[in-house]
């Protein structure tokens, strides 16, 4: 666990002035910039008081549990406000535990998100596709396990920005084999994604076979489309 992601915001969820500021800031983006959705990252660090912490570094809630009750209330209030004033807007949760009912409506006991990122599917599938084909038959559980929980939430299948940066390599560079095999691997990965239950989220650059990692300070290398393999990949994904 990333220590920075594990800290959350501590006790600030108990302060109403902070809650008001956070919700107002989000609503500003919807009202003034007309965004159509938002993703909340590291939701697990908000939901659990002990997330990423050792014994003695956290205090149980008033019921003796590890749930952050104030953060849960904040998430519900935020989702309620967004959907009340912008009914067509979507909210997404990046949450890497099995916290239940993330995408159920608040009135049904859920947290009110529209979708949850399926991080388990992403990690398992990327691991499988990165293996040499010789070893894939021994790792088919990476492809089948996600079906055990595929309908427990409203999932979106992501290629996270974190998985194509920070030294992890771009999507096509994760694929084994020679030059042609890497392009075939990306086509297979995307085809499997589109056949799997859940909404789809292809990260920028993956659709053209960009070998360089994503860099927030530079644009996508669209000039790659002048090369046959990259252009063929781009067109094949459109057909998919």
Model-derived features: positions:
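Single conserved hydrophobic/aromatic residue that forms the stacking wall/gate
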Residues: 2-13, 238-239
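Soluble or luminal CAZymes and related metallo-dependent hydrolases
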Residues: 14-22, 67-74, 181-185, 232-236
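An active-site-proximal structural segment forming one wall of the substrate-binding cleft
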Residues: 15-38
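Conserved alpha/beta catalytic core and glycan-binding cleft of carbohydrate-active enzymes
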Residues: 34-36, 51-218
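Aromatic-rich peripheral "rim/lid" segments of glycoside hydrolase catalytic domains that contact
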Residues: 215-227
């Amino acid at each position: 666990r990333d220590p920075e992601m594990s800290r959350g915001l501590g006790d600030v969820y108990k302060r109403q002035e902070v809650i008001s500021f956070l919700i107002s800031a989000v609503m500003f983006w919807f009202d003034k910039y007309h965004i159509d959705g938002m993703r909340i990252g590291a939701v697990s660090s908000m939901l659990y008081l002990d997330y990423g912490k050792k014994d003695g570094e956290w205090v149980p809630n008033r019921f003796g549990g590890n749930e952050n009750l104030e953060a849960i209330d904040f998430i519900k209030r935020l989702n309620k406000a967004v959907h009340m004033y912008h009914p067509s807007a979507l909210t997404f949760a990046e949450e890497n535990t099995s916290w239940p009912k993330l995408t159920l409506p608040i009135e049904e006991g859920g947290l009110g998100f529209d979708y949850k990122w399926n991080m388990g599917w992403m990690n398992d599938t990327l691991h499988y596709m990165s293996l040499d084909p010789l070893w894939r038959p021994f790792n088919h559980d990476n492809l089948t396990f996600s079906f055990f929980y595929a309908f427990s939430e409203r999932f979106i299948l992501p290629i996270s920005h974190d998985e194509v940066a920070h030294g992890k390599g771009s999507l096509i560079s994760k694929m084994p084999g020679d030059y042609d095999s890497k392009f075939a691997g990306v086509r297979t990965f995307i085809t499997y994604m589109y056949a799997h239950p859940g909404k789809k989220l292809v990260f920028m650059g993956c659709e053209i076979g960009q070998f360089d990692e994503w860099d927030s300070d530079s644009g996508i290398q669209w000039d790659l489309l002048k090369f046959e393999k990259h252009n063929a990949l781009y067109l094949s994904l459109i057909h998919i």
